[in-house]
Amino acid sequence: MGQDLTFKRHRRLRQTAAIRNMVRETKLHIDDLIYPIFVKEGEGVRQEVPSMPNVYQLSLDQLDAEVDEIVSLGIPAIILFGVPAEKDAVGSAAYHEHGIVQQAIRQVKESYPDLTVIADTCLCQFTDHGHCGVIEEGKILNDPSLDLLARTAVSQAKAGADIIAPSNMMDGFVAAIRAGLDSAGFTDVPVMSYAVKYASAFYGPFRDAAHSSPVFGDRKTYQMDPANRLEALREARSDVEEGADFLIVKPALSYLDIIREVKNETGLPVVAYNVSGEYSMIKAASLQGWIDEKSTVLEKLISMKRAGADLILTYFAKDVARWLNEEK
């Protein structure tokens, strides 16, 4: 080849693993991870979710062993989802003092006061119709639902939740919850809002885990259209104005562009929710031997951080923590 060619040799910075690590722009840390736990009423329950390998519904007597493992791995935070024994039209178990989530919060905080406990604040797991609000003649009522969400948030804060994470996508839900928390004296409890939550096909396995599928209709009148980008920014701005401290984008993998735009637009900490369908697809493919699970998971989570996520809520958190610890 002639000596008069001029071009940039980018491969110089890829010659060894050490050099590649030195110039790596995005890195994944255990401190980035939040692990979801499904707590279920009953005793001796450790029931694997059929569509989510290695994810379990746990009764309170099984919870300590799970949390012990999480803490030993260095994972800094969990988020709790409740699976109640009884449901009703207004989801009263969601805001009951002795609801399953409230009991789990108290139990975890008593044993591990330094572990950050996030409470998912919604009604769908607790209503007999499976929707995230009050129903009247087949319609989900926005404003009456806000009162119940605020009651739920306050009850969770009283139980000791460090962060409240409202997920139901009613208009004004952050304002209602922030006002409720402040009035009850919980001005220092932050709100991690599901600010941008799409009406996604990727939620199927979660509804299997949380027993939260709607009995009728769907959630498209309150969750977002997957085709919309500008609407996501309007939703995020509204939640910032109403007092949100963190913003969740859900799902994550199909919405990396939204994660970046929300981060640029708001400057608040952004949480990527690596949802159940994303988890189960990788699990299914890896069980068939079609992909390498570890490499695929790490690449996926790195893409979320590269897009702008500060934190990642993922069912892979324990696996990722083990892999990262092995690399130390």
From Swiss-Prot:
Q: Which residues bind Mg(2+)?
A: 235
Which Gene3D superfamilies does the protein's record reference? Answer: Aldolase class I (3.20.20.70)
| Positions bound to Zn(2+) | 122, 124, 132
The residues that the entry says bind 5-aminolevulinate 2 are 276, 315
Pfam family of the protein (one): ALAD
Q: Which cofactor does it need?
A: Zn(2+)
User: Which amino acid positions bind 5-aminolevulinate 1, per UniProt?
Assistant: 207, 219
InterPro entries, per the entry? ALAD, ALAD_AS, Aldolase_TIM
Highest taxon of source:
Bacteria
Q: Which GO terms describe its molecular function?
A: porphobilinogen synthase activity; zinc ion binding
Q: Which reaction does it catalyse?
A: 2 5-aminolevulinate = porphobilinogen + 2 H2O + H(+)
Q: Which PANTHER family match?
A: DELTA-AMINOLEVULINIC ACID DEHYDRATASE (PTHR11458:SF0)
- Its function? Catalyzes an early step in the biosynthesis of tetrapyrroles. Binds two molecules of 5-aminolevulinate per subunit, each at a distinct site, and catalyzes their condensation to form porphobilinogen.
* NCBIfam families named among the record's database cross-references: PRK09283.1
Quaternary data: Homooctamer.
Stated family: Belongs to the ALAD family.
Q: What is this protein called?
A: Delta-aminolevulinic acid dehydratase
